[in-house]
């Protein structure tokens, strides 16, 4: 019996990837799709549209929360309380305080949940972990990583996805949205990085950042992160 998946929020650049995975995996099936903005739901899945999030949750064995960041905590809590495992886009909330509160609610529900941080699943990262464990690189003197995304240039953040450029809804700009992948990747290598300073590159309107850099420490060596 395939696992039924409901999409809570469709105005996200990764929607096509999610639909592709569901369509290609015989053990998965799409159960329902919901978004507060009906224009965000593509015509290809129009037959799966439901009028409210609760109905989508009830139809599913598990849910993917890819709504705007300001909606994610509430949707995650509703799904978790209903006993539906949750895969949620990152960041899981707009602020650290909201994220901690969400984590507490998820823990109380005892429902499995995880953010969509995919770098830690890359085979290359697992190989690097083995290289570091074996000491093949010798003594580390510094670490750096960068993450680039063309979304601001190719129109990925337009239309139903324009919320990603609104700090009030997204919570973070490009640095926070992308560098979180790098922070998680370093954590997956064995030690959580400690960030000490951040510099943001602002857009012309000055509303949010289009990238930036962060300095810190990882495994007692200097760490530099860059994302845009």
Regions found by a protein language model. Name each.
Residues 1-44:
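N-terminal Rossmann-like dinucleotide-binding module
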Residues 32, 62, 142:
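Short, Asp-centered acidic motifs that coordinate Mg2+ and/or phosphate
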Residues 45-105:
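Beta-loop-alpha module in the N-terminal Rossmann-like domain of NAD(P)-dependent dehydrogenases
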Residues 90-91, 117-119, 147:
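Short strand-turn motif at the edge of the Rossmann-like AdoMet-binding core
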Residues 101-119, 139-142:
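Rossmann-fold dehydrogenase core element
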Residues 122-196:
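Predominantly a Rossmann-like dinucleotide-binding segment in NAD(P)-dependent oxidoreductases
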Residues 183-228:
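Contiguous beta-strand/loop segments that form the cofactor/metal-binding neighborhood of enzyme cores
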